[in-house]
């Protein structure tokens, strides 16, 4: 990826990076492990973002 990227693209990439986290432990505990996986998790190599 280019070093000099448009600011809007940088914001989108940062938002995607923040969203790409695991389910918090307190949520797993609160739901008695009914919610463990996070359906919108994205692997950087398998699924690419729309840019």
From Swiss-Prot:
Q: Which GO terms describe its biological process?
A: translation
Source organism per UniProt: Thermococcus kodakarensis (strain ATCC BAA-918 / JCM 12380 / KOD1)
Keyword annotations: Ribonucleoprotein, Ribosomal protein
Q: Which domain of life is it from?
A: Archaea
The entry's family comment says:
Belongs to the eukaryotic ribosomal protein eL39 family.
Q: What does the entry list under GO cellular component?
A: cytosolic large ribosomal subunit
Q: Looking at the keywords, is Transmembrane present?
A: no
Name the SUPFAM superfamilies on file.
Answer: Ribosomal protein L39e
Gene3D superfamilies from the UniProt entry: Ribosomal protein L39e (1.10.1620.10)
Say if the entry is tagged with keyword Ribosomal protein: yes
Q: What protein am I looking at?
A: Large ribosomal subunit protein eL39
The record's listing under HAMAP family reads: Ribosomal_eL39
């Amino acid at each position: 990826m280019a070093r000099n990227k448009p600011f809007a693209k940088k914001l989108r990439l940062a938002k995607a990076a923040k969203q790409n986290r695991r389910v918090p432990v307190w949520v797993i505990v609160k739901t008695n492990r009914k919610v463990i996986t996070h359906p919108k998790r994205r692997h950087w190599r398998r699924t690419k973002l729309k840019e």
